């Protein structure tokens, strides 16, 4: 394999693995903050137990996510130095803000939250976990600011062969950012909600701590349903924007080789033939693509062949069509998983309202399996986003082939891929082990564990302990 292919494999694999933990942390910490707030408002100890139990799982996930994220930024300098040299002035600014501001905020307030139980006033303690939640969201904002520049470069000028920032305001008001950011955050909230719902379903099947996990499930499904609808709405907005910013990605995601005609039908299924540049065995939904692209039931969508000819006039000779099969199917996996999650959330709330939830074993088993669906949807969405932008690293400015480090060797890349793979497998196994251990212990263990023990040698409890 070439250095370019190996560098892409390494970046894709490490990024996808890291992004298993990022949305989970954002979603879980939001749920924990919500639970602690409900405890303050309703004075119900059940919500306090919920905040502590799910908070333990959040901390485990957060720690592993931090470790996997450290390796990401090193790759820009080691494997993608030409990219870093060209856009570092623009791309580096939001990443620096993320590290110095957002992650710093998370680190401070997560410590106060961990060690502040029974030490800080209850409202201040709850504020700490909300600030952690805000910090995780702001981390995403700044990272997505950098990514949005790759999708739709703004706020820069080319000087001495480099992109230099000349408008920071344009960077943070990038239209791509404001359709991408809510889509990612709603997806993260759905991830945390469905994880809580799936674990709660497992416990309800076992008939363990039923009131606790039934309430956890109900809250998770309310958030999960709202998040799922938010994902759908923001995704629709993103599709509309793609028509302006990256029409080739839109065409590839539809397997659309020729212009669609007016109105445009959405292709639910197709056999993609990249060699002959055609699609067959298509199952189409009339008018749907026009609505997806223009929010009306009319309008045509340009095909990849038309766009290829247009791009050649702008950028010169080259192949500007991304990997079509990957882009096409990753989009459908993302959408399909999202639809299933929305239906599952509606079903769970209906069963809970009818007081049939804990006895619906078939549904609870489905919810355990659906823990994986948000991760599947998140990964598929990012695969579509990044693969669909190819051959560009920065849309219209720099190709992926131009971005790789000139001095990196295939041997060093292969070694680091194997080393990172082994380390990530160990981290993943450790996370699963710790999750299973905490889940088996249950919420009652956390409750007993948190009972304060007096350190006064003259207290009654300690005195009797010494006497015996």
From Swiss-Prot:
One annotated GO molecular function: oxidoreductase activity, acting on diphenols and related substances as donors, oxygen as acceptor
Family matches, as Pfam families: Cyt_bd_oxida_I
Transmembrane segments: 15-35, 51-71, 95-115, 124-144, 177-197, 219-239, 331-351, 366-386, 416-436
Positions that bind heme b b558: 183, 334
Subcellular location: Cell membrane
Single GO cellular component term: cytochrome complex
Record membrane topology: Multi-pass membrane protein
Record's catalysed reaction(s): 2 a ubiquinol + O2(in) + 4 H(+)(in) = 2 a ubiquinone + 2 H2O(in) + 4 H(+)(out)
InterPro entries: Cyt-d_ubiquinol_oxidase_su_1
Comment on bound cofactor: Binds 1 protoheme IX center (heme b558) per subunit. Binds 1 protoheme IX center (heme b595) per heterodimer, in conjunction with CydB.
The keyword Membrane is annotated on this UniProt entry: yes
Keyword set, alphabetical order: Cell membrane, Electron transport, Heme, Iron, Membrane, Metal-binding, Oxidoreductase, Translocase, Transmembrane, Transmembrane helix, Transport
Protein name per its UniProtKB record: Cytochrome bd ubiquinol oxidase subunit 1
């Amino acid at each position: 394999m070439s250095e370019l292919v190996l560098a892409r494999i390494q970046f894709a694999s490490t990024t996808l693995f890291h992004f298993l933990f990022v949305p989970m942390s954002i979603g879980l910490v939001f749920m924990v903050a919500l639970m602690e707030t409900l405890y303050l408002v309703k004075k119900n100890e059940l919500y306090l137990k919920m905040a502590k139990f799910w908070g333990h799982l959040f901390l485990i996930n957060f720690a592993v996510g931090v470790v996997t994220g450290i390796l990401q930024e090193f790759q820009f300098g080691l494997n993608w130095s030409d990219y870093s040299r060209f856009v570092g002035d623009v791309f580096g600014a939001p990443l620096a803000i993320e590290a110095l501001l957002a992650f710093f905020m998370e680190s401070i307030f997560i410590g106060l939250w961990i060690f502040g139980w029974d030490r800080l006033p209850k409202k201040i303690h709850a504020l700490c976990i909300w600030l952690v939640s805000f910090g995780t969201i702001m981390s995403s904002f700044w990272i997505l600011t950098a990514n949005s520049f790759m999708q739709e470069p703004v706020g820069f000028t080319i000087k001495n062969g480099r992109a230099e920032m000349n408008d920071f305001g344009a960077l943070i008001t990038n239209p791509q950012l404001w359709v991408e950011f809510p889509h990612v955050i709603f997806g993260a909230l759905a991830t945390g909600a469905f994880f809580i719902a799936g674990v709660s379903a497992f416990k309800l099947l076992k008939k363990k701590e039923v009131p606790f996990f039934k309430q956890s499930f109900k809250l998770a499904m309310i958030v999960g349903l709202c998040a799922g609808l938010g994902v759908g709405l923001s995704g629709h907005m993103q599709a509309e924007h793609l028509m302006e910013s990256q029409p080739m990605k839109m065409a590839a995601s539809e397997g659309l080789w020729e212009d669609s005609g007016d109105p445009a039908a959405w292709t639910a299924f197709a056999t993609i033939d990249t060699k002959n540049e055609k699609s067959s065995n298509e199952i189409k939904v009339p008018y749907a693509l026009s609505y997806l692209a223009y929010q009306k039931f009319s309008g045509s969508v340009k095909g990849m062949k038309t766009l290829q000819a247009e791009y050649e006039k702008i950028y010169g000779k080259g192949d500007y069509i991304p990997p079509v099969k990957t882009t096409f199917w990753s989009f459908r996996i993302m959408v399909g998983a999202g639809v299933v999650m929305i239906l599952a959330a509606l079903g769970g709330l209906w069963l809970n309202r009818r007081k049939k939830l804990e006895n619906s074993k078939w549904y609870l088993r489905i919810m355990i399996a659906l823990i994986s669906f948000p991760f599947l949807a998140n990964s598929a969405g990012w695969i579509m986003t990044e693969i669909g932008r190819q051959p560009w690293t920065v849309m219209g400015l720099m190709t992926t082939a131009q971005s790789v480090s000139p001095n990196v060797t295939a041997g060093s890349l292969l070694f680091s891929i194997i080393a990172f793979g082994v380390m990530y497998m160990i981290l993943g196994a450790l996370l699963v082990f710790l999750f299973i251990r905490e889940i088996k212990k249950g919420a009652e263990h956390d409750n007993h564990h948190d009972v304060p023990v007096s350190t006064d040698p003259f207290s009654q409890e300690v005195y009797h302990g010494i006497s015996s």
